[in-house]
């Protein structure tokens, strides 16, 4: 794990890792030293046993229901206001194996700007090959992770959502290329 800067354990953040594997959530929980919750799709809450823990540690969103998505957005804002950090995968899901990095959704960046919470991009280049969605096609090895320095928002205006999205995307994209991406 490479840290670009020391994390203030008393601070709270929105972490934005690239999403490449079904094991990304437990992996992020293992590496980050701060209490946090995830925002994730409602389908995962239906998985036996894992779903129980997921429901208690995530803001669940039904992405097909705009009203539910907005309610989840508000709930995530309340979690941040209470001092918890959030982890949001800006790709909105695990991309297909042949996709290098999916276009990011604006939700994490809108939330960060509305709450004036710093964003920390995280690059995970190896989980896709070591822990693919096809469970028996994985392999052992060393997993690299880079936790980038926080992007300080300093009361950015809402019109900056796209710029923030692009900045985080470029940080992760460039780091994936540095690691030898496709």
Report residues per predicted region.
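Catalytic core of membrane glycerolipid acyltransferases/transacylases, capturing the structured
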Residues: 9-66
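A short beta-turn/loop motif at secondary-structure boundaries
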Residues: 4-9, 137-138
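Proline- and acidic/polar-enriched loop/turn elements at helix boundaries
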Residues: 4-6, 43, 66, 91, ...
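Generic preference for hydrophobic
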Residues: 1, 15, 38, 145-147
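Non-catalytic C-terminal accessory region of glycerolipid acyltransferases
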Residues: 71-182
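Generic detector of short, locally flexible boundary/turn motifs and exposed helical patches
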Residues: 2-6, 24-28, 50-55, 84-87, ...
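A generic secondary-structure micro-motif detector
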Residues: 2, 39-40, 66, 97-99
């Amino acid at each position: 794990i490479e840290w670009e800067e020391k994390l203030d354990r008393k601070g709270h953040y929105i972490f934005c890792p690239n999403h490449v594997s079904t094991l990304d959530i437990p992996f992020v929980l293992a590496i980050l030293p701060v209490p946090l919750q995830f925002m994730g799709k409602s389908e995962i809450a239906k998985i036996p046993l894992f779903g129980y823990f997921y429901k208690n540690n995530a803001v669940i969103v039904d992405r097909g229901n705009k009203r539910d998505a907005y309610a989840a957005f508000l709930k995530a804002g309340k979690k941040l206001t209470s001092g918890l950090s959030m982890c949001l995968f800006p790709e909105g899901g695990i991309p297909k194996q042949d996709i290098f990095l999916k276009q990011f959704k604006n939700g994490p960046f809108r939330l960060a700007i509305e709450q004036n919470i710093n964003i920390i991009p995280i690059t995970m280049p190896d989980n896709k090959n070591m822990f693919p969605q096809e469970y028996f096609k994985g392999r052992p090895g060393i997993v690299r992770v880079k936790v980038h320095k926080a992007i300080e928002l300093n009361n950015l205006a809402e019109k900056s959502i796209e710029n923030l999205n692009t900045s985080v995307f470029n940080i992760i994209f460039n780091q994936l290329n540095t690691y030898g991406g496709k």
